[in-house]
Regions:
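A conserved glycine-rich beta-strand in the N-terminal activation segment of trypsin-fold
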Residues: 1-16, 38-41, 75, 130-131, ...
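Gly/Ser-rich catalytic serine loop of serine hydrolases
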Residues: 3-4, 73-79, 118-136, 205-215
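Gly/Ser-enriched beta-turn/beta-hairpin loop segments
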Residues: 49-51, 62-68, 104-119, 171-178, ...
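PDZ/PDZ-like groove recognition
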Residues: 171-226, 230-233
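Flexible, gly/ser-rich surface segments that form the specificity/activation loops bordering the active-site cleft
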Residues: 74-114, 149-152, 169-172
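C-terminal cap/linker of serine protease catalytic domains
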Residues: 140-196
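Catalytic-histidine neighborhood of serine endopeptidases
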Residues: 10-54, 58-61, 70
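Active-site-proximal beta-strands of protease catalytic cores
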Residues: 15-20, 81-93, 130-151, 159, ...
Length: 233
């Protein structure tokens, strides 16, 4: 298969590239096609099954001078300051370049152990295509991934906040495992706590079978109020 890739880092010897797990984890061989159509072999660094993102690397010794001169390291923007009505550009894996406006930044995607902010746009998009969302400064603000996207009734592009994904990306880039608990949860705010007479904290909506949370006895409906005697806020 094929998916979008973003060059995160150039450490002098390798290019570190962010891509999708579903197009690399079962591949016998990995290759990257750069902007000038040059192809080079790549190696897996690490992936996260929960979010579906992966980090791969390409040895710069495999690239010619023209390719090195044509590529650039992406700058990750702050998706927390993206507002409704902002102009954005979508780059999809099929080389399509699409423009549009942000229509919402208030939606969330619930995943195991975390909730991720979603940027919704008015850009028409094929849900089978992955891509990246950038602002008018050329900064990456969101990722549109095949296996990690909210189910929308319309066919407009949605992207998961790059700021929310950054902690996962940093761990994968260093080759570290992403901690895994195995719960789908939501925050119990003070307003919700007062309305339903439950404590503030993290409300567990679902526990994955045989996960660390399941083994420890956590159940759907529980509210986590503290971890290691530290209050959850």
């Amino acid at each position: 298969g094929q998916g979008v890739g973003v060059i995160l880092r150039d450490n002098g010897k390798q290019l570190i590239i962010l891509t999708e797990k579903n197009v690399v984890d079962k591949a016998d061989k990995l290759s990257v096609t750069f902007v000038n159509d040059m192809m080079a072999d790549a190696a897996m660094v690490k992936y996260d099954s929960n979010t579906g993102i992966a980090i791969i690397s390409v040895d710069k010794s495999l690239l010619d001078d023209a390719t090195i001169g044509a590529i650039a390291v992406a700058e990750l923007g702050n998706s927390n300051i993206v507002s409704r009505g902002a102009s954005v550009i979508a780059l999809e894996a099929n080389y399509a370049i699409l423009t549009g406006l942000v229509t919402s930044t208030t939606n969330e995607l619930s995943a195991q152990d975390n909730n991720y902010s979603v940027i919704t746009t008015d850009i028409a998009s094929n849900k089978l295509q992955s891509g990246i969302l950038i602002n008018t400064d050329g900064q990456v603000i969101g990722l549109s991934l095949q296996d990690f996207n909210p189910a929308e009734e319309n066919n407009t592009l949605t992207a998961v906040s790059i700021s929310d994904l950054s902690p996962v990306i940093e761990k994968l880039e260093s080759g570290a495992d992403v901690p895994y608990i195995g719960i789908t949860c939501t925050t119990v705010t003070e307003k919700i706590a007062n309305r339903y007479n439950i404590p503030k904290g993290v409300y567990i909506k679902q526990v994955t079978m045989d996960s660390p949370a399941f083994v420890s006895g956590l159940q759907s409906g529980d509210v986590i109020v503290a971890v290691n005697n530290t209050e959850v806020s």
